Swiss-Prot record:
Cysteines joined through disulfide linkages: C53-C162
GO CC annotations, alphabetized: extracellular space
Organism: Tachyglossus aculeatus aculeatus
Recorded GO MF terms: cytokine activity; cytokine receptor binding
Domain of life: Eukaryota
Protein name, UniProt field: Interferon beta
Localization (cell): Secreted
PANTHER family linked: INTERFERON BETA, TYPE I INTERFERON
Glycosylation sites: N76, N95, N132, N158
Sites of Phosphotyrosine modification: Y24
Signal peptide: 1-21
Length: 187
């Protein structure tokens, strides 16, 4: 009789974890595919990095936390992915007229990034209530500082085509970080 009365209690403890694990697996699949599409579109913009722009490359100092995604919990990884996408969207919404890039590809890229941000926001609100932890604020500030350095670089170079190529390559690096963070969602 005692085991029968414990079953509903045990199920009530386990069920939310099972549902959350399933949600993260779905998020992982969705995020992995969209990140792949973003990288593909960034490659489509201009192909290989122009050699004459090599002298303009710069180290934007990717936040140290991003280099060690194994330290993230799933919810922090999800929030970091969202922050990275938000900053990528902000920077690519700027003046890129000097690049010669196909505007349709840029728009498709921005649309995909925006859709992913909305999807992540819904996930964060539904699954976790999206509480702003201290860790999250610290990570968010580091990500914003990283992208501010990128934006300052672009402005300082008057949004030149070489400056945009450097930013495009750095954004591809950010997409690789997103991929590494996305793998954290699978666990």
């Amino acid at each position: 009789m005692t085991s029968r009365s414990l079953l509903p209690f045990v199920l009530s403890l386990l069920l939310p974890r099972i549902i959350m694990a399933q949600s993260y697996l779905e998020l992982y699949s969705h995020q992995w595919l969209n990140n792949w599409k973003s990288l593909h579109l960034l490659n489509e913009l201009d192909g290989q990095f122009p050699l004459h722009c090599l002298k303009e490359s710069m180290n934007f100092k990717l936040p140290a936390e991003m280099l060690h995604p194994h330290q993230f919990q799933q919810e922090n990884a999800t929030e970091a992915i969202h922050d990275l996408l938000q900053q990528i969207f902000n920077i690519f919404s700027r003046n890129h007229s000097q690049t010669g890039w196909d505007e349709a590809i840029v728009e498709k890229f921005l649309h995909g990034v925006h859709q992913e941000m909305v999807w992540l926001e819904l996930f964060l609100e539904e699954e976790m209530g999206w509480e702003n932890s201290t860790l999250r604020r610290d990570i968010s500030l580091h990500i914003k500082s990283y992208f501010k350095r990128m934006m300052d670089y672009l402005k300082g170079r008057n949004y030149s085509s070489c400056a945009w190529e450097v930013i495009r390559m750095e954004t591809k690096r950010s997409c690789l970080v997103i991929y590494r963070l996305t793998r954290k969602l699978k666990k």
